[in-house]
Amino acid sequence: VHQLPDITKFKDEWRSETKGIVLSSAERIMVKSMPGNAYRILAKDVRSYEFVIPYDEKADVGEIFTVEDRDMLFLARVVNVQHDSNYDGRWDTSIRGTELYDEEQIFNRVIAEPLGCIPRDQTKRRGAFRKAKTIPTKFSRVKRAEAEEFDFLKDTMGDIEVGVLRNGSRDTDVAVALHSSAMDHHMGIFATTGMGKSNFMKVFAASCMKLASENRSEFGLLIVDPHGEYLRGGKAGKGLLHLKPYLSSLKCYSTDPRNHSLPEVSELTISRRDILPEDIKVLHDWTGAQMDALESIERIFDGESWIDEILDENGKAMLTEKAKVSEKTVDVLVRKLENILSRNKYIKSSGSSSIPGIIEGVKSGKVVLIDIPNLSESSELFLLSLISRRIMEDYRNEDEGRKKCMVVIEEAQRVLGSDSRIARFEEIAREGRKFGVGLCAITQQPKLIDRELLSQFNTMVVMGLADRNDRMRVEESAKQDLSSLDVEIQTLEKGEAIISTLNVPFPIPAKIHRYEDYMERLRPSAPERRSFRPTPD
């Protein structure tokens, strides 16, 4: 039988170093017998750890602590912090002043989620992380995780750097990088307005450009930008054109005449012959009769010249007769088609098309940016749907020399919702990975995305969601358990993220690089570093 040490022996040490954080008389004696200012595991089970810290010290939600137990280090992530004490009842509202209670009897209780464990010996940590299947010994020492205790993560990170590991409110020097090999398994970026989605995408694209310039790219990235944020940037920052060392890995097309004088930018042109009747379905709410007429076009007219034919009087008559629809229906359809052509000046009746160059760019592993400011939402979706169709048609044919492809969709709930009229992106979500085509869905409202489609996404970047229904949809669809991180997701600040992907051992708290700072680091003259600590906004 172990004899408990005399409590008086440790009285002064206890008060000066731990401020008397206690629970019961037996635990009080045990804790006081352990020198140093580290804290101790007190409870609970394999799903949750609890320890206490002085009442005037802080522990952040999301902060990672380590628990030392013999030759192992257990890692645990804070999910909640509570005021607690050894007093009974509502003592804190029934007293006045500070003379009526003992500071050694009040403390903060920290509840932490176990993440896993690694060897204490640094030389044995490589590839040694594993899930914890037991609990640390009671009263094992607890301390805030140090930078070197995250070194094991470097071996699990990918090649597309996006930020650094964030431990609570502190940034570490461990780079956070996504995996090129996972990009055809789809990625979701979820955040409310102002949380840094556009900055994340510019950082992501910059890393892809760097890899392509070094001949290390595994996929091409297609971005259709309806807001003009990525090409030149804007008042608040810079764009991809400012990343001079890697412009050879960027192909730019624009509908904005102001950009056509730039040597790096080509005018976006789409030939009428590129368009199929199914492509224009997204541009209007068609009646049943008009939809029947559209679906009849492909069997009545030549596959590539149908637009020119239907605009001709003879073509209109042929469609009326063979599709068995009224002249009024055909007249309305033709007027809508003429309206589409007049509003989308990049659609040309003759001349070359940008689509072959776009497809060649993604197949060679480059970042292809299509800048379409001032176009309507329907025109944006039409263009993205058309290009995505052509990409899928190309990628269905085997080609060992090409790279995989990722298609970025802004406001993805418009095309991945259960009531969406656009089947093109649903097809990519369900079947794209078989052919090496992935989606990057950006949205503020993941709750509007079809559950089954969202479950196809293996990588999720969560940058703050205020709506509980949005968080629930992401949590139930993620490949890692995010349910315990609900409070942390609510408290994320601009530029902070939780990244969930099967290639890392647990959901990673990250600070995303500020694009303008990351640009400076990517300059060839900049000193080489394994990671980057971003300048706060």
Identify the residue ranges that each predicted region occupies:
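Conserved P-loop NTPase motor module
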Residues: E493-D537
